C-alpha cells in the first residue's frame, strides 16, 4: 500500500521534493538551489534545464533519505513559482531562452504599449489583473519579439509556453515523447490570458498580445490525474495528480478552504491570499482577483491577493550585495542589538512596488538616516519593511471584503524569525499564528494530489491535520502603531517616480 505523497516545490530560489505522510507530516526533503541570473538591471532569469535536472535530483534525495521507492508513493503534486515564463521547442525539448522570472521588469515598455489603449486596467474585469511586468503574458511577448526566429517557430506551432509547473509536468510525463502540456486554473489565472468566469483562454486578448494560442497549455483543475510519471525512473508510473501555484498551494496547505479565511506567506516576496469562495470580488484597492483552487469537477473558488515583490529577498540582498550579514538568520541577531529602528525606514522597491501601489517606477529607499543609525537599525528596518507592507495589503483586503481579519495565519521561511512575527502582530493589532508544519506550500500540492487519488477523502480530513505551533499577541499601543504607520507611508511616497522615462524606454 502506497503510504506517502511526493510534493515537488519549484520555487524562486530552489527546487524541493518533500515527502508527506497521511497526517501531513514531513517524512523527508531534498533541496537544490538554482542560479539567479541578472543580465541587466531589472532583469531576472533562471535556466529551465537546470531546474528540470534539479527536480530529478531532489526526488532522488527525498526518496533515498526516507528509504522509499516508487511503490511507496501514491501520487505526485506540483507547486511552483507563478508567472515565471518558459518557452521551449516541443520537438527537441530545448528552451528557446532562459525562464523570465516573475520579479523581472524588462517588459515595462510592452506594458506601456498595451496600456496606451484602455490603461493598465484594460483587461482587469475579465482576467482580474492589471497590466504589469509581474505576469506571464508580457514575458511571452518579449521572448517572441526579441529572440531571433522565435516568432516564426511559434506561428508554425513548434513552441510551447508554460510557467514552471507546466515545464516540470511536461518533462516528468515524457517530454518530447508524449509529455502532458497542461496547467491548472491557479497558474493560468496569472498569465493575463484566462477569463475568470469561463476558466478558458481569451482569443481576443491573445490577439491583442500577439501570442499564438497553440503555445498555451490546456487548463485543468488543481486536483485531477494529469498523467503518469514516465521519464524519471524513480517515480515511474506514479500519477501526477495535483497542481497549484505556490501561493494558492500555501493557502490550501493552511486549510483555508472557506470564504473569509486567509494566509500570508513570507518568502522571496510576501503573498497574502483571502478566500472569497465562489464569488469573484473585483478589488478597488490595488489587490488582484485570482483563482484560489478548483477540485476536479467542483466549482472554482476565488480569492483576493496582495502580492509584495521584495521581503525575504531584501535579506538576501543585505547578505549578498552589501555583506551586512553572512547568513540570512543573522538578520534577527543583528536586529536584536537595538531597541527600535532608530528612525530609519527601508522601502524595498528593488523591482518597483506591487500591491497595493503597483508602481513600476518606484525604487528602493532607506530614509530617516542620522549619525545615530547603525547596522542593527538597518537590519531592524529591513525586517519591519515586511510587516509594514503586509499591513498595507491587509488594509486593502479589509476595504475590499468588508471583513476585518481577526488573526493572521502565516507560513514560509521568514516565520522562523520571532522578532519579525512579534512586530507583525504589533503593527497589525491582531494575533499572528504559525502552524506546526511551516512547509504549507508543498503540503498544499500534496493535499491536491492526495484528494484526486483517494489518499485523503475530503477537506475535513485535511482540516484535522492543521495544528497551531505558536501565537504572537500584539503588544504595541495604538498611538505608537499609528505613528509608525504614518512614517512608513511617508517613506513609501519618497520612492515613487524614480525611474526616468528615458531610462524606462531606453
Curated annotation (Swiss-Prot):
Record keyword DNA-binding present: no
Positions of ATP binding: 12-14, 268, 312, 316, 413
The EC number(s) this enzyme carries: 2.7.1.30
Sample GO molecular function, one term: glycerol kinase activity
GO biological process, one term: glycerol metabolic process
Keywords: ATP-binding, Glycerol metabolism, Kinase, Nucleotide-binding, Transferase
Residues annotated as binding sn-glycerol 3-phosphate: 12, 82-83, 134, 246
UniProt cross-references to InterPro entries, sorted A to Z: ATPase_NBD, Carb_kinase_FGGY, Carb_kinase_FGGY_CS, FGGY_C, FGGY_N, Glycerol_kin
Reaction(s) the record says it catalyses: glycerol + ATP = sn-glycerol 3-phosphate + ADP + H(+)
Gene Ontology CC entries for this record: cytosol
Regulation of its function: Inhibited by fructose 1,6-bisphosphate (FBP).
Pathway as given in its UniProt record: Polyol metabolism; glycerol degradation via glycerol kinase pathway; sn-glycerol 3-phosphate from glycerol: step 1/1
Cleaved signal peptide residues: none
Pfam families: FGGY_C (PF02782), FGGY_N (PF00370)
PROSITE patterns assigned: FGGY_KINASES_1, FGGY_KINASES_2
Binding residues for glycerol: 82-83, 134, 246-247
Gene3D superfamilies to which the protein is assigned, alphabetical: 3.30.420.40
Function noted in UniProt: Key enzyme in the regulation of glycerol uptake and metabolism. Catalyzes the phosphorylation of glycerol to yield sn-glycerol 3-phosphate.
Family of this protein: Belongs to the FGGY kinase family.
Identification of the protein by name: Glycerol kinase
Organism of this sequence: Leifsonia xyli subsp. xyli (strain CTCB07)
Underlying gene: glpK
Amino acid at each position: 500500500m502506497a503510504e506517502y505523497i511526493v510534493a515537488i516545490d519549484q520555487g524562486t530560489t530552489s527546487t524541493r521534493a518533500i515527502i508527506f505522510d497521511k497526517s501531513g507530516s514531513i517524512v523527508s526533503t531534498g533541496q537544490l538551489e538554482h542560479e539567479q541570473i541578472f543580465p541587466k538591471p531589472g532583469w531576472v532569469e533562471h535556466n529551465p534545464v537546470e531546474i528540470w535536472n534539479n527536480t530529478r535530483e531532489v526526488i532522488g534525495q527525498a526518496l533515498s533519505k526516507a528509504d522509499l521507492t516508487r511503490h511507496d508513493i501514491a501520487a505526485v503534486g506540483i507547486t511552483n513559482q507563478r508567472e515565471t515564463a518558459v518557452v521551449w521547442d516541443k520537438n527537441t525539448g530545448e528552451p528557446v531562452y532562459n525562464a523570465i522570472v516573475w520579479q523581472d521588469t524588462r517588459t515595462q515598455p510592452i506594458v506601456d504599449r498595451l496600456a496606451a489603449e484602455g490603461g493598465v486596467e484594460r483587461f482587469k474585469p475579465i482576467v482580474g489583473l492589471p497590466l504589469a511586468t509581474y505576469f506571464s503574458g508580457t514575458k511571452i511577448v518579449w521572448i517572441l519579439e526579441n529572440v531571433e526566429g522565435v516568432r516564426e517557430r511559434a506561428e508554425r506551432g513548434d513552441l510551447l509556453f508554460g510557467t514552471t509547473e507546466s515545464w516540470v509536468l511536461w518533462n516528468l510525463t515524457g517530454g518530447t515523447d508524449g509529455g502532458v502540456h497542461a496547467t491548472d486554473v491557479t497558474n493560468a489565472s496569472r498569465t493575463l490570458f484566462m477569463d475568470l468566469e469561463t476558466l478558458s483562454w481569451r482569443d481576443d486578448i491573445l490577439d491583442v498580445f500577439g501570442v499564438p494560442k497553440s503555445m498555451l497549455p490546456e487548463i485543468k483543475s488543481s486536483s485531477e490525474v494529469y498523467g503518469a510519471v514516465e521519464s524519471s525512473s524513480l517515480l515511474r508510473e506514479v500519477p501526477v495528480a495535483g497542481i497549484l501555484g505556490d501561493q494558492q498551494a500555501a493557502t490550501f496547505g493552511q486549510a483555508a478552504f472557506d470564504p473569509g479565511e486567509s494566509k500570508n506567506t513570507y518568502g522571496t516576496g510576501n503573498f497574502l491570499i483571502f478566500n472569497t469562495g465562489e464569488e469573484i470580488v473585483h478589488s478597488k484597492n490595488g489587490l488582484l482577483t485570482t483563482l484560489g483552487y478548483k477540485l476536479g469537477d467542483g466549482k472554482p473558488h476565488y480569492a483576493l491577493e496582495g502580492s509584495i515583490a521584495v521581503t525575504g529577498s531584501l535579506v538576501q540582498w543585505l547578505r549578498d550585495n552589501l555583506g551586512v550579514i553572512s547568513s540570512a538568520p543573522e538578520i534577527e541577531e543583528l536586529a536584536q542589538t537595538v531597541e527600535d529602528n532608530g528612525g530609519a525606514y527601508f522601502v524595498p522597491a528593488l523591482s518597483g512596488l506591487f500591491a497595493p501601489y503597483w508602481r513600476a517606477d518606484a525604487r528602493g529607499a532607506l530614509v530617516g538616516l542620522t549619525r545615530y543609525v547603525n547596522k542593527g537599525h538597518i537590519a531592524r528596518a529591513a525586517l519591519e519593511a515586511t510587516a509594514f507592507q503586509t499591513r498595507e495589503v491587509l488594509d486593502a483586503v479589509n476595504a475590499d471584503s468588508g471583513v476585518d481579519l481577526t488573526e493572521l495565519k502565516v507560513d514560509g521561511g521568514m516565520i522562523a524569525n520571532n522578532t519579525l512575527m512579534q512586530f507583525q502582530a504589533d503593527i497589525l493589532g491582531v494575533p499572528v499564528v504559525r502552524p506546526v508544519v511551516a512547509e504549507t506550500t508543498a503540503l498544499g500540492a500534496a493535499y491536491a494530489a492526495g484528494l484526486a487519488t483517494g489518499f485523503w477523502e475530503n477537506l475535513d480530513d485535511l482540516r484535522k491535520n492543521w495544528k497551531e505551533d505558536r501565537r504572537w499577541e500584539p503588544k504595541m499601543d495604538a498611538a505608537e502603531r499609528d505613528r509608525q504607520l504614518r512614517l512608513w507611508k511617508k517613506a513609501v511616497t519618497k520612492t515613487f517616480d524614480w525611474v526616468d522615462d528615458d531610462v524606462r524606454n531606453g
